[in-house]
Amino acid sequence: DNDTFDLLGLLYAQMQREVREQAPAQALLAKLQVPVVRAALADAHFFVRDQHPVRELLNTVAESGAVWLGEDDADPQLLHKLGSAVDKIVNDYQGDEAVFAAANDDIQTHLRTLARKAEVAERRHVDAARGKERLESAKQQAQARIEQLCEQSAPPRFVQSLLRQAWSDVLTLTLLRQGEQSPEWDERQALTARIGEVTCRSKGQPTDIALGTDVETALLQVGYHHDEAAAIARRLSTPGGEDEVTSRTELAAKLKARARLGDQGDNAARKQAATPRTPAEEECYLQVRSLPFGTWFEFVVNQQGDLRRQRLSWYSPMTGNALFVNQRGQKVGEHSLDSLARLMAGGQARLVVEEKSRLIDRAWHATVRTLRSLAGQSPVSEGQP
């Protein structure tokens, strides 16, 4: 009996080393000590049966605490289920290990339900991120087409400004809605070329009424108000980009007050990320660009060095935007791959090396190594008994 107590003491000590000190799992493991001792005393094979129901239950409870690095990581629903299962064992165990097995089965069923919910939630966030990615791709393609026109035709400066702001929205949404191979996209490209041709003519020549109508219609289709669309259309269909109705200042003010398509303040972040990377940051950058989706990270969240665990759910090879979720599939952060690499190089983020073996097995093998060391024997690998 004394040997059993000693072994359990060592086993518990090893398990608790892998669980955060203030994690709820610590209290749950403590509550389980009495029924676990009783089960170990009743079964001579307790320490050698890998799939022993008590060890299975201990592993489930301990592993829940090993991944919760802070209060934000804890899952209230799972914590409630774990607490209920432990209370049931404490109250109902009278020597039948089936009580542990039933409690563990109940928890595992709950875990599978949570995993499905997390998968659905995560998929929703990934779909939204991919939608932003498609929008960004369309914006870049539209901007490239406009820059090509401005370089080749050199329309008046204010016309170029209108093209880059208002007409860019038209091209972007056409690409998103209809696609690059669509007749609508071909029509918009033809209109773009026509705008360049007409506005480059010398002032005083007649307005292209048909072009103005087409431009105004296109702007209305992407959400511009009638007066804005009409004012922009007049300038984009008149030689020299002139308009006697609405002044440049008035139109520029209206456009400045209007939210740009897909503009969420990302430009400043991109400019900041353009700072050259150090060799260490570049090495980390190359590493993160090759990581598979689903890789776990730990981020330092304060000056005390507290950590938060987040999973790299998805990233864009084109823009470098990366989406992070927690265990429940909830979006908890966004980083660019560039900023992520800088955090890693600065010691503020690190990859989590996931253990292949179960926590209970690692704890048991560590216990065995401790016993062998105390007995003056050579340590053995985890694969050995």
Q: Where in the sequence are the language-model features?
A:
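Extended, low-complexity, amphipathic alpha-helical coiled-coil/linker regions that act as scaffolds
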Residues: 1-385
